[in-house]
Amino acid sequence: MSTSTIRVAIAGVGNCATSLIQGVEYYRNADPSETVPGLMHVKFGDYHVGDIEFVAAFDVDAEKVGIDLADATEASQNCTIKIADVPQTGINVLRGPTLDGLGDHYRATIDESTAEPVDVVQALIDAKADVLVSYLPVGSEEADKFYAQAAIDAGCAFVNALPVFIASDPEWAKKFTDAGIPIVGDDIKSQIGATITHRVLARLFEERGVRVDRTMQLNVGGNMDFKNMLDRNRLESKKVSKTQAVTSNIPDGPLSGKVEDRNVHIGPSDHVQWLDDRKWAYVRLEGTAFGGVPLNLEYKLEVWDSPNSAGIIIDAVRAAKIALDRGIGGPIMPASSYLMKSPPEQLPDDVARERLEAFIIEA
């Protein structure tokens, strides 16, 4: 491990936060000289996974606010698979502001804390946080931007894991650049999820001379993320993010770069409670191949949703800290392009990975 830690604060102690926190324990003593399943980088620059320390957390759920972060990871509606025991942290979950963070389905399911919201900026300063990770529910536009501004005001880097367009918004990007504060965003990809497999296969079609004519991706899951997304009013940015992540990777053809088109349908579809934190994705691509002959591909992907994202966030956090160490402000392009669905700059995945590896070693 390095001689310094990465002091991480979390906004939203749901399943994704749980998998990240447990994952740090699971990989705390991973050998950097070995290829370790589940990690792209045991050491990311000078930082080992075990260098991550959680120093603050914010939530609005009455069952999570005021209790130790370790206990909060297993409280209320959290339902992901357990991969490690988390010792008591000595960090109690703080009451964050609600703003638009609770949709109708959340309000019908959980009790909102009656505690007074804390001063988030001061809490981040007091915790000496290096990086703030936003894990708020989809549709939390106002709340996510509140935490983004809090990160700027507190002088800590920001990792935007949800589909609210901040790093990819020129005005917000300028705010972070002017403040000298790094941001990695927007909307975390999973390690092997529906988005990364769909975009890679769509590009493969085109690179092999097959035109992508139509495609769809239907996702179902049982966690609160999927229940929250039953509210279609909160879903617009998610559909845009997932769709452009796929179509931006198609270099040519009728669907290239399309966000809205009758021949593209990508997005969450339904909530199936007994799936818990599992997600099932059904993907179909229809194309035109040699001689105008149709060629179709259909597949189903089954994953535990939150550990699948934690394997990416664990690198995003370390990329943000490296940028902070180097005094780099604004969107961290190599990390955002490789790790996020809606970065400021969409790149082919192989190119984005090369740039990220170069960033790590300062090439």
Curated annotation (Swiss-Prot):
GO MF term list: inositol-3-phosphate synthase activity; NAD+ binding
Required cofactor(s): NAD(+)
Pfam families linked to this entry: Inos-1-P_synth
Effect of disrupting the coding gene: Abolishes synthesis of myo-inositol and mycothiol (MSH or AcCys-GlcN-Ins). Increases cellular protein carbonylation in response to reactive oxygen species (ROS). Sensitive to ROS-inducing agents, including cumene hydroperoxide, hydrogen peroxide, menadione, cadmium chloride, nickel sulfate, iodoacetamide, methylglyoxal, and 1-chloro-2,4-dinitrobenzene. Sensitive to the antibiotics ciprofloxacin, streptomycin, vancomycin, neomycin, and rifamycin SV. Leads to a mild growth defect in inositol-less media.
GO biological-process terms attached to the record: inositol biosynthetic process; inositol phosphate biosynthetic process; mycothiol biosynthetic process; phospholipid biosynthetic process
Superkingdom classification of source: Bacteria
Pathways involved: Polyol metabolism; myo-inositol biosynthesis; myo-inositol from D-glucose 6-phosphate: step 1/2
NCBIfam families: mycothiol_INO1
Complex formation: Monomer.
PANTHER family the record matches: INOSITOL-3-PHOSPHATE SYNTHASE
Protein name: Inositol-3-phosphate synthase
Source species taxonomy: Bacteria, Bacillati, Actinomycetota, Actinomycetes, Mycobacteriales
The gene coding this protein: ino-1
